[in-house]
Structures are given as C-alpha cells and as structure tokens.
Design a protein with these regions (language model features):
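N-terminal FAD cofactor-binding segment of flavoenzymes
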Residues: 287-336
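Rossmann-like flavin
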Residues: 147-148, 155-167, 332-335, 339-420, ...
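Glycine-rich loop(s) and the adjacent beta-strand/alpha-helix scaffold that form part
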Residues: 269, 273-283, 288-300, 334, ...
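Flexible, low-complexity segments enriched for small/polar residues
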Residues: 48-190
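FAD cofactor-binding and catalytic pocket of flavoenzymes
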Residues: 56, 316-318, 342, 532-659, ...
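Conserved redox-cofactor binding core of oxidoreductases
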Residues: 178, 188-235, 364-461, 465-466, ...
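A glycine-rich dinucleotide-binding beta-alpha-beta segment and adjacent secondary-structure elements
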Residues: 422-426, 463, 671-747
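N-terminal secretory signal peptides
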Residues: 1-16
Length: 774
C-alpha cells in the first residue's frame, strides 16, 4: 500500500469514528460563543475590536488554524511573505481573511468556521501521517510546523477520497486569498496593474477616447431617478404599521398590488412592463444592496462580499452539508442582479433549444414569440458588436489559435455596452456607467412610472390562501404576498416583514426562487395532487471549466476590452440527415475571460508555495479561457444547497471541449497550459493532451467547475404534473404566482443566458399586463 493510500484509509477510518464527531462538535460549539471577549485576547484581536467590539469572528483556536493554513500554503520564508513583512509590516493576513469572511455575512462565516474546525481537528486522527513524517501523534493542525502543514495539505490534494480533495480546495482559498488581497506589496510582485480608479490620469485619458458622453449622462440621470424610488429602512420603520402575528412575533407590513422578488434580468423587465401598461402599485424586492456606479470600487476583496452570492456544491460530513469548491456557482446580489455584474455578452437564445422546449416539454412558446422582445431589448440596451480595435490580447490569441487549427470562430461578440473604455472590471460592476443594465436602464424605466424598490430585504416564503372547491384551472391556492426580513449590508436579519399583494412574481434566481417555493409548501401541494414535486429539479450550470495558457508576450488579462471578443463553438446535429441549421445544437463554446488576483490564485496549480508564486508573477503573460458546456439538467437545488454531478452521457463531450481548448492555447503560442484542478494538471506540449486529459480524469471529476450560469429549478412546460410553471410563467398550483428568471429554463442553453432571460421577463411581463388590463 502506498503512503497516499495509507493516508486515505487512515482518514476514512478517522471520519467514521464517533470521537472525531465529538471533537468536531466541541470545536464548533466554541465558535458559537459570539458574545465572548475571547478574540480580544488573541494576537489578531485588533481587527475584531475595531469591527465588532467583544464579538469574535474566529475563536483563538480558529485564528491559529487560519494562520497555519496561510503558513502552509505561503510559508513565512517565501519571497512574498518576506516582502509583506518588510514593506507592509502592519498587514496581518489572518485579520485580512477574518474581515473578508465577516463581510460575506453570517451564513458564509458559519460555513468557514466549520471548515476551519474540520481542517484543524482531522490531523488528530491521522496516525499514519504522523508516523511517516516523525510528527507527534494526535497533533492538531494549529500546532504543525509550516512545512509539515504544507505536506499535509498536499496529502489532502492527492487523496483518492473526493471529499478530502474538496476540503483541500477550501483550504487553498483560505491559504491564498489573504496574500493576494494585498495591494501595496503582492500586486507589485505579480505586476498586476490594479484598478484604474488608482490611476486617474490613465482613466481620464481613456475616457477622452469616447466619441460622446450623451449615453453616460443618460445613465447617470437614470440611476438618480432610481435612487429616489429606493425605500429607506428607517423610513419604513417609522411609517409602517407593525402587526402582531401568531406566537407573539411582530413584523412590519407593506401593502401593494404586485410584488416582484428579484431585480435582475427577468424581474426588472417584468416590473418595467407592468409599470408601463398597468396602474398597479409595484414593489420590487431585492436581497442585495442598492449600489451606484461610484460604489463599484474595482477591488475583489471589497466587492466580492457586497455583490456576489456564491453557492458551493456540498460534501456530507456526519449528516451536515459543508461547502466545497468542487462546483462553485456565482450569482449577483445587488439591485440589478447578476446582469449588472456580468460581462454584458448578448447571445440570442438558440433556435433548436426553444424548439426542443416545445417538442419535448410541451411548452407553448417558440422563437417567434420571443423575437419581437429580443429586437426591442437589443435597441433599448444598444446591443452591438465590439469594435475590432478594442479586442484584447487574450482574445486575439484565441482567434489566432482557432485560425491555426482551422476551427470556425465567431466574433467580435455583441454586448449591451456603449462606448466601453476597457477598464477590465465588468464583473465587479461598471464604475463608468457604460454597461447598459437593469440598474441604469430597465429599473429606472419602472421607477419613473411609480414602481418602488426595497433593497436589503430577503424573502423566505410566499403567503398562500386555500381556494374554495377545486380552485381556478386546477390551482388550489392563491398567492397573497410574501414574508421575509430586512437585513443590514452583511445580510444579517433585522425586522421581519410581510408584503401583502394580489400577485407575486418570483425572479430571485435558480437558487432562491425554488427555495422560496419549497419554504412555502408548493412541493407538498403538488404531491397532494399526485404531481411530481419538480421544484428544484432539472438544474444545470453550463459545467464551465476555466483554464489558462502561459505565453511569452504580455496579454494583460485584467484589462480586456471587452472581456470577450472572439469565441469558438462546437455544434452537434440532432438529426444527421438534416441540413437545417435550426437542428444544430451548441455543444460547447470557448470564450476568453477577465481575471484578477484573488480568482487567479485559485486557478493556478499548487505544487509548492514557490511554484504557485512563480505562476502568479506571470499573471500578465497568462490567457484565461472558459469552456462552457451544454450540460444535461441533472442537478437539483435543495433547501440549503445544491447537488450537481456532470451526467455520464456528457463525459465524452466535456473531454472533447477540454482537449479543444488546450489545442487552441498551444496553437496560439502558449508554452504551457494548466487547468483548475485539485492536483496540478499542467501540459507543456500538445502531445500530452490526449494522454493527460483522459476520460478517467473526467469520471473522477478532478477538474473543478466554476459557473455563473445557473439554470432550471422551476422549469416551464406544458405538463402540470411534471413542470412547475406554464409557458407564461404562471404557477400550475398557485393562482397569482409567477416565475420570471433563469430558473424557468427546462434545459441548458449552451450560450450565455442573460439575453434570453431579458426576453422571457419582457414576454411574461407583457402577458401579465394584458391579463390585468389598464
């Protein structure tokens, strides 16, 4: 038995022992002492005093564990750590990570505490590891020497047990993120140019290249108009009735006609259509903050907690779901939703996909139903091809590689942006108001016609009222509003709130919309009628893989104009005898990507601290490519997490996509190609592609999936027993309840879904407005 196999067997036995559970529970209980002054007595206590007074972010043991994780991945004797100590002596990586985790909110912090405790306690039960390397038995990680901690993490990385490999990924994030957050030293070491916000001369020069400022003036005025219709929490508390409900709990009560839950691509267009065509009172509820362009600070450490909602696939440990980085899905949590922080790519829905919805799902919708909405949205958001002069170095390399291989390539891509100046921070919000989004175009349209926005309000359930008899069209209940709670900027719960309305539109996204329905009892309503529970099912992600090519010439991946300029598509024909292009499905697409230090540190393979830092120093010579795969909708959203495994039928196609991407990189001139995998997956020549990128690698799912395109969970269709809503977004089970976001999509699209969701939102909004009348 190899040392790695012995280690895996030892850990497998350890995790099955009751003593491990007891030890872990004891550590987790200590973390719950939130009112204890423990943090103030630790070496890293000054941050906790500044932020929280006597409330701890991490316990002393957790702080020591975080410090050891950081030391394990970036030991104090490495170049970056030495320079940090010399040039920025007051920078404490543990404090930096504590502040970062705290800013993400209580749920994220609880998950991180559990992960930290797990990583700390696990070595106590790994006698094989201790014996082989001459370590005292029963050591916790916090007591390891940095070199031994590093060796321990490499054992986790190479484990044959998938949960342990996923734990390594979580530890890698903790161990690298606080190092690459540092602006004064680390950015200088890796030659990262940093935000244009820090270089006013460069910013002003590029702004001057724009042909006019008319559009920027218009979008600025739009955001001001929207701001006036955003409800302040203090005003609500002062002016609203407080109702006492069963159990003695108080809640604020708002009355309106239509409540739209979610302000992104779908919800914004529903609200705009209803505001224009009806006289109904409309309230748009958003769990995230209202941020204006000046709030987009172009720094990952500051913006990620405020604008990103990150969902991790989970690993079961003693009945508890703990987050991993095996599959990560990122969505937006701010007024304007994901559409405000995406890359503004505008791909029309593929005709074959819409046709399949009709033929295979019984959906009463076809491409012609969406075409007028696509056309209107294209004009409203000024969707146009990116000028050739603005294509970034990375995307030119993508085109060069595709041409060398004779692969058909498409581009420049079309985007909903006007006079983009190429700052490279599309994914952190457009500070210059050049990206045309729900925030600065669509929601202001609704606001100017009377709609209001309630930000920092998390909805948890729909209020349902039973209908007499058989109800209307088989619908047994009526929606009468929603319940939830106001939050602070971190998402911490404040007052309970009840919003009473005659109609409810869920547009909260493929995670929140299904969970709201689950909490409302809709799956049980369906089961009582003999229908499939369906809610949360048919979830897909585009199974996106991000990988990198290391080039000799600078490509500047953080300053792309636009983030994606060219792309390569692979098609499959569902009818081999047909020449009709409408029978050609997009199987996968390869697109150039933006990148910044925190995210890049997770993509870079980890062999040792020195090798990882060497890769990071070549940041500007790196091209990042995403393989977006049209996966089968086999995932499932649950009440607290999501379950996702790539379908076995997709393995061969996914492998073809990975190999094609690697070949393009080498054909473009890359000297090596590396993938976002648990173990280092590095190719130094094209001859290694077929052998290294194997079907077995895909089956073991050792390559990590990171997606921004969740779809499904409230699938539309024509079968009330199988589908959650009909083709107009109407719930099959609840009268007055609608869904209008990407959770509607019964199958994966194969292209970026935002434009499709815009069109579905406008289509559903127009249909609902026609039902209501003026």
């Amino acid at each position: 038995m190899s040392s790695q196999q012995a280690f895996d067997a030892d850990l497998a036995r350890a995790m099955s022992r009751r003593q491990f559970l007891v030890r872990l529970a004891r550590a987790s209980s200590a973390a719950l002492l939130a009112s204890s002054p423990l943090g103030c007595a630790t070496a890293h206590g000054r941050l906790q005093r500044r932020l929280l007074g006597d409330t701890v972010i991490f316990t002393p043991v957790q702080e020591k564990t975080v410090a050891k994780i950081i030391d394990g991945f970036n030991p104090p004797d490495t170049e970056i750590r030495k320079r940090l100590k010399a040039e920025d002596p007051h920078y404490d990586p543990v404090d930096a990570y504590a502040e970062f985790a705290w800013a993400h909110g209580d749920d994220f912090l609880a998950n991180m505490r559990f992960l930290i405790d797990f990583v700390n306690v696990l070595p106590t039960f790994t006698r094989t590891f201790a014996t082989r390397y001459g370590l005292p038995a029963r050591f916790e990680l916090q007591r390891f020497h940095p070199l031994d901690a590093n060796r321990y993490f490499l054992f986790l990385r190479d484990s044959g047990l998938r949960p342990l490999r996923n734990i390594f990924s979580g530890a890698k994030f903790i161990g690298t993120a606080p190092i690459y957050m540092n602006e004064r030293v680390t950015w200088k070491v890796m030659n990262y140019p940093g935000p244009w916000l820090l270089d006013p001369a460069k910013r002003d020069a590029d702004l001057a290249h724009s042909t006019s400022f008319d559009m920027a003036k218009e979008t600025d005025d739009n955001v001001i108009a929207l701001r006036r219709r955003v409800l302040a929490h203090d005003d609500l508390r002062a002016g609203l009735e407080t109702a006492r409900i069963a159990g003695g709990q108080d809640r604020l009560v708002i009355e309106t006609d239509i409540v739209v839950v979610g302000s992104g691509a779908g919800g914004s267009f529903v609200a705009a259509e209803l505001a224009e065509k009806t006289s109904q009172r409309i309230l748009i509820v958003e769990k995230g903050e209202f941020l204006e362009p000046a709030d987009f600070l172009q720094r990952e450490r500051l913006m990620m907690p405020r604008i990103f909602d990150t969902e991790f696939s989970t690993t079961q440990v003693f009945g508890r779901e703990i987050p991993t980085l095996s599959t990560t899905v990122v969505t937006g949590k701010l007024v304007g939703g994901s559409a405000t922080i995406n890359h503004a790519l505008a791909f029309e829905p593929p005709r074959p996909v819409i046709r399949d919805w009709r033929e295979q799902n019984g959906a009463d919708i076809d491409y012609d139903d969406l075409a007028p909405h696509l056309d209107a949205i294209g004009k409203l958001l000024r969707i146009a091809a990116v000028p050739e002069s603005q294509i970034s170095g990375g995307n030119l390399a993508l085109r060069r590689g595709a041409q060398a291989l004779g692969l058909p390539h498409h581009g420049p891509t079309r985007r909903n942006a006007h006079e983009c100046i190429g700052c490279g921070y599309c994914d952190l919000g457009c500070r210059y108001n050049r990206k045309l989004t729900p925030l600065n175009i669509v929601l202001p349209m609704a606001a100017r016609r009377g709609a209001q926005v309630l930000a920092n309000c998390r909805v948890d359930a729909v209020l349902l009222q039973p209908l007499a008899g058989d109800g209307r069209d088989g619908r047994t209940h009526r929606a009468t509003g929603v319940t939830g709670y106001l939050t602070d900027a971190r998402g911490t719960k404040r007052e309970r709130i009840e919003i009473r309305a005659r109609r409810v539109v869920l547009a909260a996204g493929p995670f929140s919309s299904p969970r709201i329905l689950m909490a409302s009892g809709v799956p049980d309503l369906r089961s009582a009628k003999g229908a499939q529970r369906a809610v949360g099912e048919r979830f897909s992600t585009h199974a996106t893989i991000t990988f990198c090519g290391d080039f000799d010439e600078p490509l500047y991946p953080s300053a792309a104009t636009p983030p994606m300029g060219y792309f390569v598509k692979k098609y499959e024909v569902d009818d081999q005898a047909s020449a009709d292009p409408d029978r050609h499905h997009v199987r996968y697409a390869l697109e150039g990507m933006l990148n910044h230090p925190l995210a890049h540190a997770q993509l870079v393979p980890y062999e040792s601290a020195e090798s990882h830092q060497a890769y990071m120093k070549r940041f500007n010579q790196t091209m990042t490519l995403a393989v977006m795969f049209r996966d089968r909708p086999v995932g499932r959203v649950t009440s607290r997490a999501f379950e996702y495994e790539l379908a076995e039928e997709d393995h061969a196609g996914w492998l073809d996509a990975l190999r094609t991407g690697a070949r393009i990189m080498f054909a473009a001139g890359a000297r090596r190609v590396f993938f976002n995998a648990h173990r280092p997956l590095i190719l130094s020549e094209p001859a290694q592609i077929d052998e290294t990128l194997s079907l077995e690698l895909v089956r073991q799912q050792r390559i990590q999936i990171t997606s921004g395109h969740p779809m499904g969970g409230c699938a539309l269709g024509g079968d009330r027993r199988r589908d959650v809503v009909d083709s107009r977004g109407r719930s099959w089970d609840v009268d007055g309840l609608y869904v209008a976001d990407s959770s509607l999509l019964p199958t994966s699209l194969g292209v970026n879904p935002c434009y499709t969701v815009y069109a579905l939102g406008r289509f559903i909004g127009r249909t609902l407005a026609d039902e209501i009348g003026a």
